[in-house]
Amino acid sequence: QAANLFRSLGIGSEDVVAYVLPNCNETVLALLGGATAGIVSPVNPLLDPAQIAAVLRETNAKVVVTLKAFPKSEVAQTTAQAVADAPNVHTVLEIDLNRYLTPPKSWLVPLLRPKNPVSHQAKVLDFNTEMAKQNTTLDFEDIQEDRVAALFHTGGTTGMPKVAQHLSSGIIYNGWVGSTLLFTEEDNVICP
């Protein structure tokens, strides 16, 4: 469904979907859906807006998945600032973490939710609402050849982060090595 959503937003096999997220269920969906529909670019949510914008520009990201404004988190605000400096981003998909809370906390979030003054021109949509509209099987032919499936940024210790390409085969190999040599069925891992 996530891959179909990204394709419905104009993402082709060589287009980039970036996500600026903490670890949550939707992070895995954005990772796998982005790599299936096009090229996925995970971005560290702890980077400052200028660094995130540099990664978005360097990867030519067209869609960004991030959090909806949430109490005690600045991920949404930081990402909105970055998107303002990344002119090729045409859509921002937001994830509301309130869905993970139970009453009474879930009742308080709408009252405490910080404002997120958006200064960018990208269309803002709800990730889960839009994904629910999609088919559960791919609406497009999956590419059967090895290709760039992910763009990961470096730490940026000597300036702005640089981007490293990862092929589908490399991602699969890393998963195999991890499951064979490093981890057991008791471990929880997001790969790559």
Feature locations, PLM:
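Structural core segment of the AMP-binding/adenylate-forming
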Residues: 8-9, 39-129
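Short beta->alpha linker loops
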Residues: 22-23, 47, 70, 74, ...
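Short amphipathic alpha-helical segments
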Residues: 30-32, 76-80, 106, 166, ...
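Conserved acidic residues
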Residues: 15, 53, 62, 90, ...
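Conserved AMP-binding/adenylate-forming
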Residues: 2-50, 189-192
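Conserved adenylate-forming
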Residues: 6-11, 134-147, 151-192
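Well-ordered alpha-helical segments embedded in enzymatic catalytic cores
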Residues: 1, 26, 51-54, 170-177
